[in-house]
Amino acid sequence: MVRVKICGITSLEDALVAVEAGADALGFVFHDESPRHVTPEQAAGIIAGLPPFIQTVGLFVNRPPAFVNDTATRCRLDLVQLHGDEPPEFCDAVERRVIKAFRVKDISSLDPIRHYRVAAHLLDAYSPKAYGGTGLTFNWDIAAAAKAFGPLILAGGLTPDNVREAVETVKPYAVDVSGGVESAPGRKDAARVREFIRRAKGW
């Protein structure tokens, strides 16, 4: 069964809604330019209130390895998601398992993947304006091809309305959503969270 990560968590209330709906992982954004940005202190407080067996993922964009590792330790993150232009050797310096994000324009966007020894690859839609969270989709046939390189997490413009088709088309290891289940940036809509997870998992 496909796994689901709800990203851009900014409150314990939203986190618990996602957990109760069946989310496998929660994402916390440590990128100042994002409307879903949280501080390490905020994230640590939310994570301390979670039940066991829920994975926590910290999202970073072009931050120094020392900041990434320090934040991961302070917040007790399970995984680190690198969503910027980090090279393979950067991933090797991270002290947690790494999810490396790649922004997809076309099939050539997959070329760098083979150089990264990471826990999973995340594919998101390319935008010149932002590193992620844009709500844009991309060609899912490209995503299906990326599975040859290891566990694939599909992101980019997913919503309750299209996630079932995405899962059936790509058959990814996991799907990742943020804006597609929000009522406003950084505010999750409980009904949309529940419906997204239900449809993603085929319940």
Swiss-Prot record:
SUPFAM superfamilies: Ribulose-phoshate binding barrel. It comes from the Bacteria. Coiled coil: none annotated. Pfam families: PRAI. The keyword Isomerase applies. It is an enzyme of class 5 (isomerase). GO terms for molecular function: phosphoribosylanthranilate isomerase activity. It catalyses: N-(5-phospho-beta-D-ribosyl)anthranilate = 1-(2-carboxyphenylamino)-1-deoxy-D-ribulose 5-phosphate. InterPro entries: Aldolase_TIM, PRAI_dom, RibuloseP-bd_barrel, TrpF_fam. Belongs to the TrpF family. This is N-(5'-phosphoribosyl)anthranilate isomerase. It comes from Geobacter sulfurreducens (strain ATCC 51573 / DSM 12127 / PCA).
